[in-house]
Design a protein with these regions (language model features):
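Glycan-processing catalytic domains of CAZymes
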Residues: 1-189
Length: 189
């Protein structure tokens, strides 16, 4: 079994559960009446269906049908951009009728420049410049306006992956994740 992927039956059970437990809750976020559902890693989602877009599209359409049967106008399907690059994004829009894209965290698009910490304002500027003008990473190489579906910006409140460093003696040495800088000074004035 691939790390992170689940069985197709598990995905089907998940869709039933989220419709019943979450989508019907009065405070659940809906866009134009459609419950918002986001897939974090499309490549992992595709592994459930042996990387076959057509098979995965059938499962998404079944999900949409269940959502409509539950009384909603449709499903608002969102994809997290860092794993939706190039052909994967285009295929997700085409096969799954992806409604929007978003970002999980600024650092997926903008490498924090200073170590052991980077100022919040610097991280914000890097991310929002990528959204507006491109030149960033993982889906924001071009401005967000080039994405063929609406892009919902992200407001990261900070970033600190140091607790994931497993008490390493050299946790203060910059290298690959999670040994990176933290975002500091995000307190509004």
């Amino acid at each position: 079994n691939v790390k992170g992927a689940v069985k197709q039956e598990t995905f089907e059970a998940l869709t039933d559960y989220v419709i019943k437990t979450y989508f019907k809750h009065p405070s659940y976020w809906k866009i134009d009446g459609a419950p918002y559902f986001s897939i974090y890693e499309f490549h992992t989602f595709l592994q459930i269906f042996d990387n076959d877009y057509a098979k995965a599209a059938v499962a998404i359409e079944r999900f949409r049908t269940k959502v409509k049967a539950a009384g909603f106008p449709d499903l608002h399907l969102n994809g997290v951009l860092w794993a939706l690059k190039g052909e994967v994004l285009n295929n997700a829009v085409q096969y799954f009728k992806l409604n929007s894209a978003t970002s999980y965290v600024w650092i997926h698009h903008f490498e924090l420049p200073s170590f052991p910490s980077t100022e919040y304002a610097v991280a914000a500027e890097g991310y929002f410049n990528g959204v507006a003008s491109g030149g960033a990473n993982n889906g924001l190489e071009k401005p967000a306006s080039n994405i063929p579906i609406p892009y919902h910006i992200n407001v990261s409140m900070g970033w600190d992956s140091s607790p994931r460093c497993k008490n390493s003696d050299d946790w203060m040495t910059r290298r690959d994740y999670p040994f990176g800088p933290v975002i500091v000074n995000n307190t509004p004035s």
